[in-house]
Swiss-Prot record:
The lineage of its organism: Eukaryota, Metazoa, Spiralia, Lophotrochozoa, Mollusca. The keyword Secreted applies. Keywords: Disulfide bond, Knottin, Secreted, Signal, Toxin. Residues 1-22 form the signal peptide. GO terms for molecular function: ion channel inhibitor activity; toxin activity. Disulfide bonds join 52-67, 59-71, 66-80. It comes from Conus litteratus. GO terms for cellular component: extracellular region. It comes from the Eukaryota. The presence of a 'disulfide through disulfide knot' structurally defines this protein as a knottin. Residues 23-50 form a propeptide. The keyword Signal applies. It is found in: Secreted. Belongs to the conotoxin O1 superfamily. This is Conotoxin Lt6.5.
Amino acid sequence: MKLTCVPIVAMLFLMACQLITADYSREKHGYSAEKSSDKIQDSFYSKLTKGCTDEGGDCDPGNHNCCRGSCLVLQHKAVCGILYTMVSR
């Protein structure tokens, strides 16, 4: 009887250790995956906004680097802006 109980208790102990370790590693792995996902997302958005010039800033007409609107050439200077047209009624 004692010889049968010892292996059963040992197996239960090892299974409990394995389950605890699996839960711990899953949480730790999930955190690192979430962290790397945030890094990828941040680099994606930084690439989208890189080189974007705000309204009124100097721009290159051939590069299309304005955040909003387009690159307008006004009095020998190129600036980002939105061209509004006035319509008379």
